[in-house]
């Protein structure tokens, strides 16, 4: 398995955009649209896991997430997805580790993540900060992890 950190100039950008847009998770369409619109700027990246030459998972490293602007946390890991056929192989853990290494290399001591999932990210070492309002009028859990 290979993990690539990508900008829009990466050879696999279009392939991962297509994969995200067609995956079984509805948020994949949101990521694909952001990729098509070239919304990843500066140090923001999409990370993709490839197995046998095809994408099987992805996540993103971004400055902002869906929290209200009054919360000044950054950067974020988001859009964590692994294809159902490849789950149980620790691919999401490897994606998270790749993002942590990238964040550390870029001088960030922590990475934040929002999620409605209970108990999922704690197993990777994330610590819950609390429940925070989002731009969508919902409340999400906010987690952090040292990079």
What are these regions (language model features)?
Residues 37-43:
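Short loop/turn motifs at secondary-structure junctions and domain boundaries
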Residues 64-77, 87, 135:
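A conserved beta-turn-beta hairpin within the catalytic core of GNAT-like acetyltransferases
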Residues 103-115:
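Conserved GNAT acetyl-CoA-binding A-motif
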Residues 79-82, 88-101, 113:
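Conserved acetyl-CoA-binding loop-helix of GNAT-fold acetyltransferases
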Residues 1-34, 46, 50, 147:
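Short amphipathic alpha-helix that is part of the acyltransferase structural core
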């Amino acid at each position: 398995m290979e993990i690539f950190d990508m900008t829009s100039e990466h050879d696999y950008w279009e392939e991962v955009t297509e994969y995200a847009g067609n995956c079984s998770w509805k948020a994949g369409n949101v990521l694909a649209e952001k990729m098509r619109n070239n919304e990843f700027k500066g140090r923001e990246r999409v990370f993709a896991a490839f197995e046998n030459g095809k994408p099987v998972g992805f996540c993103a490293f971004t400055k902002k997430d869906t929290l209200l602007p009054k919360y000044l946390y950054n950067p974020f890991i988001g859009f964590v997805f692994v294809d159902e056929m490849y789950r149980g192989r620790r691919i999401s853990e490897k994606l998270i580790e790749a993002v942590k290494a990238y964040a550390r290399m870029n001088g960030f001591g922590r990475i934040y993540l929002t999620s409605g999932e209970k108990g999922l990210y704690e197993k990777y070492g994330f610590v819950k900060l609390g429940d925070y309002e989002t731009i969508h009028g919902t409340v999400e859990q906010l987690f952090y992890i040292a990079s």
